[in-house]
Amino acid sequence: MSGLRCPAARAPACLVVAVALCGAGGLTAQQPVTREQVVAAALAHGPRVALAAPDTSAARAGLITARELQNPTVSASYSKDVPQYHASVELPLDLPWLRSARIRVAAEARSSARLRFAFERAGARFDAEQAYTAALAEAAHARLSRRNALDADSLLRMAVLRRDAGDASELDVQLSTVNAGQLANQAAGDSADAVSALLEVQRVMGLAADRPAIALADTLETPGADAAVPAGVPLRVAAAEASARSADAALALAHRSVFASPSLTLGIDSHDPTGAEPGLLPTFGLALTFPLLNFNGGAIAAAAAQRDLARAELDVARRESEAAVAQARRDLAVATAKAVRDRALVASADRVAAMSLAAYAEGAVALPSVLEAQRQAREALGHLIDDLAAASAAASAVRLFSDTETTP
């Protein structure tokens, strides 16, 4: 490659480029992965989903606990008074209005946890898409920087040839040397950034992130224009609604728990040494809790505070969800329009750069004009890469904040 046959003055810069390119490409075979494969791996093995999954298990366990009946208590005793042997069974009575309220609290909490987990899965998909898009953008910038470094090397050799032929000055050679060195350093930095972005994709997938093991199979494309918001309640809002319903049910349970559940006691007495009371003597009892010393005020106040908090969080979730969707849709529209204009600008800037280089080879224009034309071409293509990445990120954000429970 011509970009690696450098003059002695530029040997250190070219060595940096060569090392960076080896790091970016990798010395071992890398498995190509598509965007969908990265998303699937993130959902199956990613850290975000793994951290969110236990919450749903805990909520399901809470619902199982709420539905369970209390175990009876068996007791046995001995007394000197007749009858001397006593045995009893205490059976807690789960009142229907307390049981139903308790189960409703746990059921709504489980619904909220399930919806939050669905939102976390959507967030994991969003993170994977964002990481993949960022890696594509960094890889495109690295390729652009490498091409720019090679073009700058060619321009330097052209300036040296024209100087040796008497058609250019030493100033042109020095300007070309500075330009080539700067672009070589930029290529090295962009190559390192591309490797870092690729390792971030591996981390999101749940893979080791110490060395590149994958390659990007997709390319940066303009997202489709059909980013319609699906019908239904967004996942984040639905989870907040379930939390609010659970808090309402918890407050109702606290009010109903002023009278705690009673318990029924059944037992027998036996063994009268005098023989006055032969056989077994049945006993029966009913234990009731009367609110004489407290009316469950602390629990009621705490439940009321949690209800107010849940309602406030629901209001915030609704407002933030609406704002996030609107902002993401605006960002998508702006980035898509900019990408369309960038394509036309890139074509024009490339033509200007090619024409200026040809004119310099013929001695028709000065070297600074060529450098400026190439700089504008680099910036135009760099803006196109950034705007395509921004459009893809905005499309992912629209999907994240508008996903509903029925979204596939």
Indicate residue ranges for each PLM-predicted region.
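Bacterial N-terminal signal peptides
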Residues: 12-24
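Amphipathic alpha-helical coiled-coil scaffold segments and their short linker/junction regions
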Residues: 36-45, 105, 172-173, 177-179, ...
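A glycine-/polar-enriched beta->alpha junction
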Residues: 40-50, 57-72, 87-105, 114-122, ...
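Residues that define the transmembrane beta-barrel architecture of outer-membrane proteins
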Residues: 81-85, 278-282
